[in-house]
Amino acid sequence: MKNSYLITTSFLLTILIIYIILFFYTFFNLNNEFNYAFKSLETLNFHKKYSKKIHHIRDESSLDFLFKNPKVEDLLFTTINSLDGKEKIVLFQGDSWMEQITFPVDDNFISAELVQKFKNKKKVGFINAGTSSYSPSIMNLQLDVLEEEFQIFPNIIIAYIDQTDIGDENCRYKYNKIYENDVLISVQPELHLMYKDLFNYSQIYGLSEIFLNEKNKILKTFKLVNFKFKYGLKKSGIRFFRKYISRSEIDKSRLKKCYGEEILSNLVNPKDSEIKYFADTIKEYIKKVNQKKHVEKIFIVTAPHKKHFDKNFIEGISYKLNVSDIIDSILQENKNVTHINFSKILLNNDNLNNEDIWLDDNMHFNSNFHGNFFIK
């Protein structure tokens, strides 16, 4: 009995000592704890609201790179020019490739400037809704949000589908989808993501609420330490359950880390089942667009990555799949959609020097080459 009491007391005392050490360490390093916290309750609440439906929206830090003074809705979409009195509204959708129009990483706004020059000649309004890692399922839902929440009814949609979208659909979004009467109504964010990721906002939300709502440094430290304990314990408990107890395919899939290598694996070693699933998400997106009576025309744009060029295969790793080919196959049954296939154009251009057209990731075009797509 005494041994049991001694062990319990020692355990609790150890926990208390650890807590006190963590408290003082956190207190004296408090300024470093909130580097990624939201800067305002307005952006925090906006981000939480729409991420519940469409998994994630733009990071608050991206607003620092916008070509104009940002508004909170720029977390979801950016109005390139005023829509008032315009005869046509053009909506750009897609991932960071399309986001690059208004958020270039090198502060070179060539694409945005070319779009603006065009709108000065025509009565056309442009909206850029491109967001990092947006693929057809998320774009599908984004259309509803823009229409229902912001009364944006585009006449023309230019949708970019990236080579990485097949990986995003199969790894990030597949098991987070919510359907109602066979209609996709949301892609839920992972509340306790099992790995560090750009879209692990559940922890950032908690930190931001403490940062923005609590002014007293001692209370802020107390709440922060408690939050970290609770979040860490819950995350560890979920991980243990999924790894050792659950037999659910969904639980097992959520242990997978959707890092770059996993996302790109579909291009290196494509599987028929994953290609079919991805094709189905594209068909679902096209079906959604076709249901929008205000949409007159849709263009789907695809482009290669550097590894699609034979001479650029690195360390024996080559891409066996090109998403552009999947789009071509699908659109044989959808003649009302136009595919702008830059894979076909660029890969067959013997005069192209493709060494100088990329950003460091070898997936995105640099701003100078990116601007070529908006010249005509």
Task: Enumerate the language-model features and the residues they cover.
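Histidine-centered active-site loop/cap adjacent to the catalytic His
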Residues: N3-S10, I357-K376
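Hydrophobic membrane-insertion alpha-helices, especially the h-region
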Residues: T8-Y25
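Membrane/wall-proximal cationic-aromatic binding patches
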Residues: N29-F118, D251, L264, N349, ...
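Loop/turn elements at helix/coil->beta-strand transitions in domains of secreted/extracellular proteins
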Residues: E87-K88, K121-V124, I152-I157, F229, ...
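Conserved SGNH/GDSL esterase-like catalytic core that processes O-acyl groups on lipids
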Residues: V90-L91, E99-V187
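Short, amphipathic alpha-helical "lid/cap" segments that border enzyme active or binding sites
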Residues: P136, N140-L143, D272-I275, A279, ...
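Serine-dependent acyl-ester chemistry module
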Residues: Q163-D328, F342-N348
